[in-house]
Amino acid sequence: MLFGRKMPSSEKFRDYVLAQFKGELRVTTRKMMGEYILYADGKIFGGIYDDRLLVKPVAAAKSMLPDAKLQLPYDGAKPMLRVTAEQIADKGLLARLLDAMLPELPAVKKKK
């Protein structure tokens, strides 16, 4: 464990998560310190941390994932909702989750 973290997320897991979103919405990633920030339509909706899919705990996500546990992506971060392996395997659920979350998410701020 380095600085209280496990090993970085694998590209294999990132590729699997992206494949589950493929064709539903435009989902992209940006690598940051061994992990992946997830964007949909230019908005950050979650990330891949230690090979876990975590999403922002907006009202729509809490409603659609009522049993999801809040977990920290890394030390000092705000808690996010953990999406289980079974939920990741359900492409329809992921598409509905993003459709519901996007209106609640702020646009990414442009750097000056």
Placement of each model-derived feature along the sequence:
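Charge-dense, helix-prone N-terminal extensions
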Residues: 1-112
